[in-house]
Each structure stands twice: as C-alpha cells, then as structure tokens.
A protein has these predicted regions:
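N-terminal Sec-pathway targeting helices
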Residues: 2-13
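Aromatic- and carboxylate-lined catalytic core of secreted/periplasmic carbohydrate-active enzymes
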Residues: 377, 381-400
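C-terminal segment of classical bacterial N-terminal signal peptides
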Residues: 18-29
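Extracellular glycoside hydrolase catalytic/binding regions
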Residues: 57, 61-62, 173-353, 372-376, ...
Length: 400
C-alpha cells in the first residue's frame, strides 16, 4: 500500500514537472513570436569618430547622449549600433575610451541594447583625407604602395592592393606586428571595458570590408575565424560579421549567397550576419534581389541576419580619377517617404530577423537630407527632423 502511494506521488510529481516545462516552452514560443526584434539607429559620437588626417570643427552638443537616447526611446526604439573607428582611438585613446564608457552607462540608464561597430569608410583617412575614416595611419605610412590621398574606395588601386594584402595577413606596423593581431588587441581592450554593461549586446569587429577577387572569400573566413577566436577569450556576447563591398551582383567576384556564407566561421555560436540596404526592395527590383541573397546567406550559414544599415538613396554615375565609372549618392534626388519607410519595414517583417538599425543619427549635418534624423538649433539643442517622425510613426504602425 505504501509503495503504491509512493508510486502515485512520483507520477503526480513527474506530471507536474512535465506540465510546467510544456507551459514554459509555450510561453517562450509565444514570446519569441510576439516580441519585436532589435529596432534602432546607427549613432555617431565625437572622439570615437574623429579621423587622424583632418580636423573636425564641430563641437559635441551638451547632453548629446542623454537627449539622443531619450528621443530614440520615445520613438519606440530599443537599439543602437554605435559606430566607432580604430584610427579615432589612436588619435586620442583617453577621450575615445571615456566617451565609449559614457555611452555604455547612458544606454544602461535608458535600457537600450548596443552593438559596437568597428567601422571603416573608404578604408582610412590616410587614403581618403577628405571623407575616409577607419584604419589607423601607421598601417599605411611606411609603405610607398599606399600614398597619402591615393584613394580608399573599392575602385582605387591603392585600396585594392591594401585590402588584398590585409586578407593575406601581410599588413604590418613598423615593428613587424601584423594587422590582424594589432586589431584583435585593440578590440579586446574595447570588449573588456564594455562587456559587463547590461546594455552591451555584442560587437561588429569590421564593418563592410572590401573584397577584390573571388579567392578572397575563404581568406576572409580565416580572418573572421581568427577574430572570433580572439574575442571569444574575453566575451560570450554576440559577434557580428559584416557583408563585404562592393555588392555588384554582376562582378567576377561572385557576390552570391554561397560565397557570402563562406565567410562565416565554423563555430557559429553567437554569430550574426549583418548587411546593408540602401534602396526600396520592391517586387522584382534589384534591391529585392540583393536582399534575398543576404537572407539566403543566413539560411545557408545557419546564423541570424541583421540589417545593420538601411535608408533610401538615389545614385548617379560619375567618373573617378582612374577613369572608371562609379555610382555616387545623389543628395538632391535621395529621399525617403512615409510610404517608403513602411514598405521597407513590411518587407523586413517577412523574414525572421535579428534586428535593424536605420542610417543614421548624428549631430553633424549631412548633405543627404534623409540621413539627418536630428539637427541642431542655434543654441545647440537637438531638434528632430521630419525623418525622425517618419521613422517613429512607421515603427508604431509596424510593431503594434
């Protein structure tokens, strides 16, 4: 009789445990299906975005971060992709780190989730003193192949030569230390300072690197594997791997889902694939074709996808110094309407995405109007533009 009672008690206990697990799983499934993804903006700072080869005359507005994070939160956003540059750290490491820590503390205060993006645009201010920012000057100035001002975009021979050598792990400083090792050391210091903050979600260790030949896909995998292994010694948080540029679907480089997936390391734990979208992904359009390639990359590689930059721009052909035709953003023709914004967010909802970040949030005015979510009044106060309100309203409609 006593044994029967015990057996009955064990059965009831197992039933209760099973029911609890089932309810927990159901709740997690419901939560996953109804919770909006990361929804946010790219945000630029001051000392963390200062190039070595030119002076920035603008002044950081008082309460810039507090006001920005308040406005971002009020617009229904929960995320920031914080853009920083390696060369900015080299220029002023103390101011750089102080600003990063201030960002982390402010994000903690507002409950925002931050991905810290080691950004580069046109490789470096060494190669493009007018517009470029990214890698520090010491990786260029000791080699006559990379003359100052010789061009950092994908169409320039100096940039192509530098990136090809970078993927071969041949770029070195004056002491003979290779660039991969130096970059890993820099990023590990960043991670050690930020990782304990609850607002820190992860790190993008190199945004939109250049690729110049079809054999570089596997070389980029070696680089990504090296960086992931190095950063995994100091963090368990998400690591974001970026798409490459140029994204020309007709080029011999082979911009396909299969090749893009080759960049992803075999250890996929906590890895996210990031890409950018600067156009309307309308049905049967070139932008939709690009988007589908990126989405399929995530499926092949078995990693989440993250739209780390998006907006809508118009491009016009021009001829660069080498006589090549390049497509540059046309500021006057570029714009994004409420209908455009809703269309893009609706398209994003068709996929299981990690999140997205609109390009962008910056107190410095940009010549492309729809790149300005805020502006400054004569007293240095942040004033939301019409594009802030367009984005805010679209978020409310998309994530009711």
């Amino acid at each position: 009789m006593l044994m029967n009672v015990r057996l009955c008690g064990c059965f009831i206990l197992l039933l209760l445990i099973s029911t609890f697990i089932s309810i927990s799983l159901l709740n997690s499934q419901i939560f996953a299906s109804t919770t909006k993804p990361l929804v946010g903006v790219n945000l630029l700072g001051y000392y963390t975005a200062t190039p070595q080869s030119r002076e920035i005359k603008s002044i950081l507005p008082e309460n810039y971060y507090d006001e920005s994070f308040r406005l971002i939160s009020q617009a229904g956003m929960n995320h920031i992709r914080y853009v920083f540059y390696w060369e900015s750290y080299v220029k002023d490491p103390i101011a750089f780190m102080n600003e990063l820590l201030f960002v982390a503390n402010s994000a903690d205060k507002y409950g925002l989730k931050v991905i810290y993006d080691n950004h580069q645009f046109h490789t470096s201010s060494w190669l493009n003193p007018q517009r470029g920012t990214g890698f520090p000057n010491f990786l260029f100035q000791n080699d006559t192949h990379y003359q100052y001002g010789s061009g950092g975009g994908p169409k320039y021979p100096a940039a192509a030569a530098w990136w090809q050598k970078w993927w071969n792990r041949g770029i070195r400083d004056s002491n003979g230390t290779d660039g991969w090792t130096l970059q890993a050391q820099f990023l590990k210091n960043i991670v050690k300072s930020l990782d304990s903050h609850p607002s820190t979600l992860g790190y993008e260790f190199l945004s939109e690197p250049q690729i110049h030949s079809v054999d570089e896909w596997t070389k980029i995998n070696k680089y990504n594997t090296f960086m992931v292994d190095a950063l995994r010694t100091v963090t368990k948080k998400d690591l974001i791997i970026s798409m490459t540029i140029p994204v020309d679907l007709k080029s011999p480089i082979g911009v396909t889902s299969e090749n893009l997936a080759k960049m992803i390391p075999s250890n996929q734990t906590g890895i996210v694939f990031k890409f950018s979208l600067y156009g309307l992904p309308s049905a049967n359009s070139y932008q939709e074709q690009r988007l589908n390639i990126f989405v399929n990359t995530g499926k092949i590689a078995h990693v989440p996808i993250y739209i780390g930059e998006w907006n809508n721009v118009a491009r016009e052909p021009s001829v660069n110094e080498e006589g090549d035709t390049v497509y540059e953003i046309d500021p006057k023709a570029s714009d994004i309407t409420p209908e455009d914004t809703s269309l893009i967010l609706k398209k994003f909802s068709e996929f299981d995405i990690y999140g997205w970040a609109f390009w962008y949030w910056n107190f410095r005015p940009h010549k492309v109007d729809n790149f300005n979510l805020v502006t400054l009044d004569e007293n240095g106060n942040l004033i939301p533009t019409k594009y802030y309100n367009i984005l805010k309203n679209a978020i409310v409609s998309a994530y009711k």
